[in-house]
């Protein structure tokens, strides 16, 4: 005989209120049985399992609408879509709160140190304005190149290198040099982050060498292709301006054919973000395009920005457009 429970028993069992259960029922997430005479709710074991699932998803911050969609379609791709959405929402909020905390820290120092009270408001406004500008740079970046649409054709397009400039002529050489730079530097147990992992061509080299690498990319379709090619590769949604990891997490950061997509202000933010998640004795290796009339400008920008972190820039020019840059 099947065990049945009242709403009060379920609430006590799961340490929640009866109102919460009624709310989920009202939203269509639960459909308990009703007694024919008094219309009291009756819950079976399946209802308990479903409610526990709902509570678990809510603990991850998923919306009622997202949970409803997952319960209606429990396919892998649907799970992935909603979990990636929540991953990005959480990461965005962490970065937003982090900037607020930095602003408050600076404001508190000003309050303690400023002797002229009338100057405080001016200082506050300047601090908040600087913080807002940084958040604006981070939040306004958009994929203007449709990498999702390019993902399935990317590898073939790189091989064909159909453009007049032949910018991918030494693509494999650049990837191999970045790989060798890392292998010559890092310990075998070191953690590597690749930003703009794309279809996994560089990450695959590290995987074959049994290195611990995580790849992030803002393109879901690029990540999907990378995961198909390298099932053991750990991939996450993420980008230069809001890296989804804690301070001093990685021994090495690598990136190829991605950094040049940022403008000058975005590059500064990206360098600060990379330095934030890089361990103090860590290293950054970039393989990227630098057009001749801009190469010196880009290298000078890198050198100036990393100098404040006690780092220096060493680079090798591969051809007219391609450079491998080490920040060490």
Question: Which role does the model predict for each range below?
Answer:
Residues 254:
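A conserved beta-strand element that flanks and buttresses the S-adenosyl-L-methionine
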Residues 1-64:
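Basic helix-turn-helix/winged-helix DNA-binding cores
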Residues 257-258:
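Short catalytic micro-motifs in class I SAM-dependent methyltransferases
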Residues 268-280:
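A short glycine-rich, Lys/Arg-flanked "PGG" loop and its adjoining helix->strand segment in the class I
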Residues 71-131:
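Short, charged amphipathic alpha-helical surface segments
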Residues 194:
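Class I SAM-dependent methyltransferase core
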Residues 115-185, 190, 199-232, 237-242, ...:
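Class I (Rossmann-like) S-adenosyl-L-methionine-dependent methyltransferase catalytic domain
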Residues 24, 43, 147, 154, ...:
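Conserved active-site tyrosine of GNAT-family acetyltransferases
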């Amino acid at each position: 005989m099947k065990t049945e429970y009242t709403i009060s028993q379920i609430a006590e069992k799961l340490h929640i209120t009866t109102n919460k259960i009624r709310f989920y029922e009202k939203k269509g997430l639960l459909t308990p049985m009703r007694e024919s005479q008094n219309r009291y709710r009756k819950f079976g074991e399946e209802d308990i399992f479903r409610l526990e699932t709902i509570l678990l998803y809510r603990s991850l911050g998923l919306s009622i609408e997202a949970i409803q969609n997952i319960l209606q379609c429990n396919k892998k791709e649907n799970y992935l879509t909603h979990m990636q959405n929540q991953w990005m929402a959480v990461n965005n909020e962490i970065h937003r709160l982090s900037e607020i905390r930095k602003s408050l820290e600076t404001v508190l120092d000003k309050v303690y140190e400023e002797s002229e009270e009338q100057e405080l408001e001016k200082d506050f406004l300047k601090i908040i304005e600087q913080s807002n500008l940084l958040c604006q740079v981070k939040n306004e970046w958009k994929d203007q190149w449709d990498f999702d649409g390019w993902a399935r054709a990317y590898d073939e397009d790189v091989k064909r290198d159909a453009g007049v400039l032949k910018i991918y002529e030494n693509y494999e050489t650049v990837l191999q040099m970045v790989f060798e730079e890392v292998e010559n530097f890092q310990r075998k147990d070191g953690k590597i982050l690749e930003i703009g992992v794309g279809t996994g061509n560089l990450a695959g080299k590290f995987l074959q060498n049994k290195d611990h690498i995580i790849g992030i990319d803002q393109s879901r379709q690029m990540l999907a292709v990378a995961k198909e090619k390298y099932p053991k590769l750990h991939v996450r949604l993420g980008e230069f301006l809001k890296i989804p990891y804690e301070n001093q997490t990685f021994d090495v950061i690598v990136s190829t054919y991605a950094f040049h997509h940022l403008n000058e202000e975005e590059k500064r933010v990206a360098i600060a973000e990379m330095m934030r998640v890089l361990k103090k004795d860590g290293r950054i290796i970039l393989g990227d395009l630098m057009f001749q009339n801009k190469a010196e400008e880009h290298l000078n920008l890198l050198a100036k920005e990393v100098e404040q972190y006690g780092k220096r820039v060493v680079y090798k020019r591969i051809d007219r457009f391609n450079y491998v840059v080490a920040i060490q």
